[in-house]
């Protein structure tokens, strides 16, 4: 089965595309990176049984980047509405103004090459035989418990045996004036 696309990214994509279209009129370069990633970890050992969201690998939101003669600016957010498009533009503008104002007299922004933006479209998804979510926490923990018991049964000298599993479902979206890239994968 193919990993399904993120409904969160799908809902926000038209507004993100509109934001890129607005920003490309003002800046030499602009892009938006969106992420919707969910991770879970399971463990069974002598100290107990655990099924929990892995906060380190769970993320959701967007980062917009622009470049002009004043430098680079980035702004991150979790949701976007049509009413907020102008506010995002204003935040980027304020960041670039602050960068320019912070430069010492007589110095200027160090010119760097712009990120590549040749036309490219990509939509890819990994496939998996069984998605961990379809098993459910109870089934995963039951299987890990069986693995732990089998490990303990190998030899009476085995004091403890732990069984652990993590998974992360990753959804990414990258938009620029010439690029529309999406990936959905399970790791």
Give a label for each model feature.
Residues 1-187:
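Active-site bordering "gate/hinge" segments
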């Amino acid at each position: 089965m193919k990993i399904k696309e993120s409904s969160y990214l799908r809902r926000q994509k038209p507004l993100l595309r509109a934001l890129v279209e607005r920003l490309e009129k003002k800046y030499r370069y602009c892009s938006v990176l969106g992420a919707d990633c969910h991770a879970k970890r399971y463990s069974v050992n002598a100290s107990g049984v655990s099924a929990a969201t892995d906060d380190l690998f769970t993320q959701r939101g967007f980062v917009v980047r622009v470049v002009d003669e004043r430098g680079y600016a980035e702004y991150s957010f979790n949701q976007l509405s049509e009413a907020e498009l102008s506010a995002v533009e204003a935040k980027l503008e304020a960041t670039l103004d602050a960068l320019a104002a912070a430069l010492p007299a007589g110095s200027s922004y160090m010119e760097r090459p712009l990120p590549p933006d040749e036309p490219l479209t990509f939509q890819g998804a990994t496939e998996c035989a069984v998605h961990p979510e379809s098993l459910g926490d109870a089934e995963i923990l039951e299987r890990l418990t069986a693995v732990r018991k089998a490990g303990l049964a190998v030899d009476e000298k085995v004091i403890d045996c732990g069984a652990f599993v993590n998974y992360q479902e990753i959804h990414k979206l990258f938009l620029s004036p010439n690029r529309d890239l999406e990936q959905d994968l399970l790791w």
